[in-house]
């Protein structure tokens, strides 16, 4: 958490693992700097241990390839991929990209520790004149549907 800024972690979608070293080192050398959240895409099983070993905070599992916000069109081997990440992860495993409803993730709740809803929140805010009540109501409904 960076004092006064409220930033606990950074998610940088297109930063390859092999190019993270310099940024990670810089963040680790600054007191109170945010952590770098590791993104893991549906990749070959062999890369998953490397991608997860130094994770901090949580792992952001990308549920599908392409652009976020287009709906739940998850990778065809989503369960196998998530199980492999979970098996190797030292931190909670969250899944995001294309999640709009509890139904989108209910069949994966036995594997993931949480769901990340991003683009849909932005859409709700825009549709409701940036009134946070719409997002709060959405979260309550989502939680109720997930029995959380």
Go through each PLM region and give its residues.
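Catalytic cores of alpha/beta
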Residues: 43-53, 95, 99-115
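Structural motif
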Residues: 5, 54, 88, 110-111
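Conserved, mostly hydrophobic/aromatic
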Residues: 2, 51, 108, 118, ...
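Expand to "…catalyze enediolate/carbanion chemistry for C-C bond making/breaking, isomerization
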Residues: 63, 87, 100-108, 138-148
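Active-site-adjacent beta->alpha loops and helix N-cap segments on the catalytic face
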Residues: 11-31, 44-50, 68-83, 102-105, ...
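Hydrophobic faces of well-ordered beta-strands that scaffold small-molecule active sites
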Residues: 10-12, 36-39, 59-61, 93-97, ...
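C-terminal helical cap(s) of enzyme catalytic domains, especially alpha/beta-barrels
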Residues: 122-148
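Surface-exposed amphipathic alpha-helices with a cationic face
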Residues: 3, 24-31, 79-88, 139-147
């Amino acid at each position: 958490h960076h004092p006064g800024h409220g930033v606990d972690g950074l998610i940088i979608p297109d930063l390859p693992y092999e190019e993270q070293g310099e940024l990670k080192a810089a963040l680790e050398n600054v007191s109170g700097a945010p952590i770098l959240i590791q993104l893991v895409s549906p990749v070959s099983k062999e890369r998953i241990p490397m991608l997860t070993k130094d994770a901090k905070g949580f792992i952001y599992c990308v549920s599908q390839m392409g652009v976020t916000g287009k709906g739940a069109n998850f990778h065809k081997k989503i369960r196998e991929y998530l199980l492999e990440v979970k098996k190797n992860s030292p931190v909670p495993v969250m899944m995001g990209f294309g999640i709009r409803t509890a139904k989108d993730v209910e069949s994966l709740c036995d594997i993931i520790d949480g769901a990340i809803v991003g683009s849909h929140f932005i859409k709700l805010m825009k549709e409701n004149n940036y009134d946070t009540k719409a997002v709060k109501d959405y979260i309550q409904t989502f939680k109720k549907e997930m029995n959380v």
